[in-house]
Regions:
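TPR-adjacent "capping" and linker segments in tetratricopeptide-repeat scaffold/adaptor proteins
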Residues: 1-20, 30-35, 72, 85-92
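Structural signature of tandem alpha-helical TPR/SEL1-like repeats
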Residues: 20-28, 56-84, 108-120, 142-150, ...
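TPR/TPR-like (Sel1-like) alpha-helical repeat modules
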Residues: 48-52, 66-69, 73-79, 122-126, ...
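Solenoid-like repeat scaffolds
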Residues: 31-38, 86-91, 108, 119-125, ...
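Terminal, low-structured helical/coil segments at or just beyond the last alpha-helical repeat
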Residues: 3-5, 183-218
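Conserved small-residue packing positions in alpha-helical repeats and bundles
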Residues: 14-18, 48, 55, 103, ...
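Generic helix N-cap/helix-start motif at coil->alpha-helix transitions
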Residues: 4-12, 22-24, 39-42, 58-63, ...
Length: 218
């Protein structure tokens, strides 16, 4: 329910032309950066902050002086603004980070759609960074089984960042599946630079061992 509108505008001020121009120049610069690299996380976050703040501040007609939004409406307006930005950037065939943001926004209301977006993101990024972020996002949402499924379906341990392995092992531990976590840990044997991941493997091995001991003692 929208709060009653006040007829008074005492103390209300519109953004100055200089302020609007500064915002526009910053936004244009960020959009240019994202056009060059649609997976520039810092640029996306900065632009998302601009568009979400603008959406939350403005009334339904885009004029900040015509009405006030309650907190839930502000959040919805901000989320819709970021959603529109993500959709715009996701049209680039090189873009995977915007797809992850879209999945984050939709995972509660459109579970299958979110998983589909994460799968597309993983397919667009041969390095595995998108896959690791997608698995982490699902873990944060409490969807450990879906996180494991995404990882199993797309991980190439010999070619991709070992961070994917970390996320899959942790997802299996989140799901109280230490034996499965151990199997995924073994997949890191395929990574060509074993010296580079020695610390990671030791860290994950300790986590798996602790989980096994916990289950054995239960």
């Amino acid at each position: 329910m929208r709060r009653p509108l006040s007829a008074s505008r005492v103390g209300s001020t519109r953004p100055t032309k200089t302020a609007r121009r500064g915002d526009t120049l910053h936004e244009d610069a960020l959009r240019s950066m994202l056009n060059d690299d649609p997976n520039n996380v810092r640029a996306f976050q900065a632009l998302a902050a601009i568009v979400s703040r603008r959406a939350a501040e403005n009334g339904p007609d885009g004029d900040p002086l015509t009405g006030a939004l309650d907190p839930s409406e502000k959040q919805r307006a901000a989320d819709l603004a970021v959603w529109s930005l993500g959709e715009e950037l996701a049209g680039n065939p090189r873009a995977w980070h915007p797809l992850i943001e879209l999945a984050r926004l939709s995972v509660q209301d459109d579970h299958e759609g979110a998983l589909r977006r994460l799968a597309i993101a993983a397919e667009r990024d041969p390095s595995g960074e998108a896959l690791a972020e997608g698995i982490a996002m699902l873990r944060d949402a409490g969807l450990s089984s879906e996180a494991i499924g995404l990882g199993i379906g797309h991980w190439r341990p010999k070619e991709q960042t070992p961070e994917v392995g970390r996320q899959i092992v942790q997802a299996a531990l989140d799901a109280d599946r230490p034996l499965e976590a151990k199997q995924h840990l073994r997949s890191l044997d395929l990574y060509p630079d074993q010296a580079a991941i020695a610390d990671l493997r030791a860290e994950l091995a300790r986590a798996v061992a602790q989980a096994e001991q916990h289950i054995a003692g239960a």
